[in-house]
Amino acid sequence: MMQLLRRLADQGRTIILVTHATANITLCDRVVFLGQGGRLCYFGSPQDSLKFFGVNTGDFADIYNKLEEEKTVLHEAKRFQNSPDHQRYIANHLSHPTSQQTSNLSPKKVSQNPFKQLTLLTRRYFDLTRRDLVNLALALLTAPIGISLIPLAIRDKNPLILGSEPDPSLAPLALRVLFVFTCAAIWVGLSSSLQEIVKEAAIFLRERLVNLGLIPYLGSKVLILGSLALLQTLLMVGVILIGFKSPEPNLISWQLGVGITTFLTLLTCMSLGLMVSALVKNSQQANSALPLLLLPQIIFSGVLFKMEGIASKVSWLMLSRWSVGAYGSLVNVNAMIPAPTKFPNGTTLPQPFEATPVYDPTWHNLNLNFGLLLLHTSVYLTVTFWLQKRKDIF
């Protein structure tokens, strides 16, 4: 191997070799010995290195033995800096700028074009996504398939429209159906994004060293995941419109309202997934975090349990609360609650579900739900940016 490298060097090529093998090292024109911490202990010809370190055996391995201790490394590095070999092999080969040239020298930072980076990263991320057809199909079809099973479970009931006769079980049933819509969106949103940063951790750090911008990097993630969320929304809304009778619109059309709510829920969940992906250390931790993220969304959504006291405050931190709230406002769940049944003694029959401002069919309430979902998205992406920025090593 060394003979081959010598022939290549004789042909005019520059060969740089990092090795601990000392056999045939005399074939090299120059050798470099580095001590602990990358300190330069010697640079020059192989024969002169033996003289410099006082090795009389002719074995270059003895030089390694001399440089094992840190104190020796510091001493030899300082000695070489003041030696004739340093002057001969290094100082004499360096150009010395004039004082005028020195004053004009200033560090130049390589400029970056964020739009070009965004385009390149988005194209690369898109190519990676479309090549993994199995995961792409699962991401697109999981929620629609799950939602399509609901009509089989509730049989001939129409949970999203008010019937001609009062039904105390209609409002709770409608909420459960809407809750499944939310859970399906949360599940696919998180599972689509939890791996997207942590799996590229090593690549990100390398590219960051060559001027990769954080905003283009995260922007490419948001663009592709947002496009995926749009496709998922179209499929989910299509299944919902086919499988369930549409309620009468109170504010906006059901088709538009359910589409906006589903898309915002998916986008918010994907932003949460990116934040967690930037926080964890490896892909296994990201997978393990999925149940931990999903369970609080279920518990504090306000559907399974009544939110009172501190639980009502915690529910504000859950995107599921705002997603179900938006769905409930569009359906007007409160209007499905029949008038209470009064007994002759003046008491009333307890209702399985009571009207709540969370599902008021007003523009204020609907905009509040949409706005809080967008606020969650902004917070998650901001924290993601901060977490990625902390990983910089320069």
Tell where the protein language model's regions lie, with residue ranges.
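Helical "lid/switch" subdomain of P-loop NTPase nucleotide-binding domains
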Residues: 1-4, 21-27, 38
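Conserved catalytic segment of ABC-fold P-loop ATPases
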Residues: 4, 14, 27-33
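Conserved ATPase "switch" residues in P-loop NTPase domains
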Residues: 9-10, 130, 208
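Alpha-helical transmembrane segments and their short interhelical loops
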Residues: 11, 18, 22-25, 216, ...
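Membrane-lumen (extracellular) interface motif
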Residues: 25, 130-133, 137, 151-174, ...
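Topological signature of polytopic alpha-helical transporters
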Residues: 30-174, 178, 319-394
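Short alpha-helical transmembrane interface motifs in multi-pass membrane proteins
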Residues: 107-108, 175, 183-188, 254-261
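Hydrophobic alpha-helical transmembrane segments of multi-pass membrane transport proteins
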Residues: 150, 167, 171-242
